[in-house]
Amino acid sequence: MPLVGFMKEKKRATFYLYKNIDGRKLRYLLHKLENVENVDIDTLRRAIEAEKKYKRSITLTEEEEVIIQRLGKSANLLLNCELVKLDEGERA
């Protein structure tokens, strides 16, 4: 008897980040994007200008898939914006 109902295809997402972070921190930032409404223009500029040297792939949960679908292609940019905000907080 096949286990079709139990074998759901897992989706992966790859992000290009300007700072090297682990999967746990990436997931944390991704979940923070769930409630994002607006982005500071200066933060956005820094995120766009930053060199994205690091590539990180994760297998998405159902919740994360919904977040990615809602944000579309802007998800990667918004993740980098969150990283910029974290860096600004660490320096202050």
From Swiss-Prot:
Record-linked InterPro entries: MJ0366-like, Ribbon_hlx_hlx
Signal peptide bounds: none
BP term (GO), one: regulation of DNA-templated transcription
The protein's name: Uncharacterized protein MJ0366
